[in-house]
Amino acid sequence: MYVLKNGQVLNASGELENKDVLIQNGKVNLIADSIEVTSGEEFDATGKLIAPGFIDVHVHLREPGGEHKETILTGTQAAARGGYTTICSMPNTKPVPDSKEVMESLQAKIKETAKVRVLPYASITTSLGTDELVDFEALKEAGAFAFTDDGVGVQLAGTMYEAMKRAAALDMAIVAHCEDNSLIYGGVVHDGIFAEKEGLKGIPNIAESVQIARDVLLAEAAGCHYHVCHISTKESVRVVRDAKRAGIRVTAEVSPHHLILDEEAIPGNDGNWKMNPPLRSKEDRAALLEGLLDGTIDFIATDHAPHAAEEKNVPMEQAAFGIVGLETAFPLLYTHFVKTKEWTLKQLIDWMTVKPAECFKLPYGKLEEGSVADIVVLDLEKEANIDPATFYSKGKNTPFVGETCIGWPVATFSEGTLVYNEGEIK
């Protein structure tokens, strides 16, 4: 049992109120002006924000098969430090969770080592990136969160349509990395001014938007919840906006780096700036920000993609795609958008908590009496530099090295258990 004393909570209007919070038996038992500590532990939250634990539906934990990049343990330690209490792990592992047996093995490993809640995806196709569909029903029974071939797009419309019909029958979501392989052209960055300046092959916007346009029509026909991963282009935003207006059940996420950076920020041919989708144009970034504010884009997800140093500290042509994000998402977004008054604090918290929970019908993401005690304590005055040497993640691959941010998670509770406190994993 914990009593969080003298903290602040956001009310429904987005105003800060001074409150104490009682955690008992893994639940939020009481939120009140003052709670007397008669047993359990007192946690001093003076001057700090007590918020729901963050939810990230797009995380690469790499285990099994990629333990040199990340493990379930290190990835969930990173999540705890970043204030995340629920993360959803992508299936581009070896082996792929494409069968009941592999999924059950993965679930056992999660139960054994994870520091926060991990909800694993199953793949859409066997081995991921094929045209043979998995056994959707068996994988749902084994605990799959949803179905995705993230890392690659499902190339054949017929394969995707059949997958959507099967998912819809089970009331499960299809989550899509949208990329038409015939339109990538071997690109390593956005097909724009940086690619031209550096003489690099570029990935055009249409590689993403064409597949989203196809998929929203398939989702409409199948009656399926279709979720777009890491949306990155103005055309994609337009397609999703039109689909929502048409009543199609489509949701979308955007990553912090696509909101903060564009291709003009890339300093040179450095693999730590290589990600998929790539950093796009200024116009694309503006469309993402507009789409998030008008509800076209539903929430924020990190696409945390750790790699070993030797896979990133090379030119872009040789580097792996992806950057880490779990430990830096909140401070970056708070600094860039809340401190600058572009967003309210409530908007940011909602996009990291209740919005993803609502999209995927998760019973998390709220701080209220009776809710699961997934809680992050945030020091909105704390100022620190982003230093990969302090990361719990094995991946140190971030383009934000050295950036000064204000507003950091200082403690995280997962189902009432203190898992991170003042720089230390419990």
Curated annotation (Swiss-Prot):
Its cofactor is Zn(2+). Catalyzes the reversible cyclization of carbamoyl aspartate to dihydroorotate. The active site is at 303. Pathway: Pyrimidine metabolism; UMP biosynthesis via de novo pathway; (S)-dihydroorotate from bicarbonate: step 3/3. Coiled coil: none annotated. PANTHER family: ALLANTOINASE. The lineage of its organism: Bacteria, Bacillati, Bacillota, Bacilli, Bacillales. NCBIfam families: PRK09357.1-2 (NF006837), pyrC_multi (TIGR00857). GO terms for cellular component: cytoplasm. This is Dihydroorotase. It comes from Listeria monocytogenes serotype 4b (strain CLIP80459). Substrate binds at residues 60-62, 92, 276, 307, 321-322. Pfam families: Amidohydro_1. Keywords: Hydrolase, Metal-binding, Pyrimidine biosynthesis, Zinc.
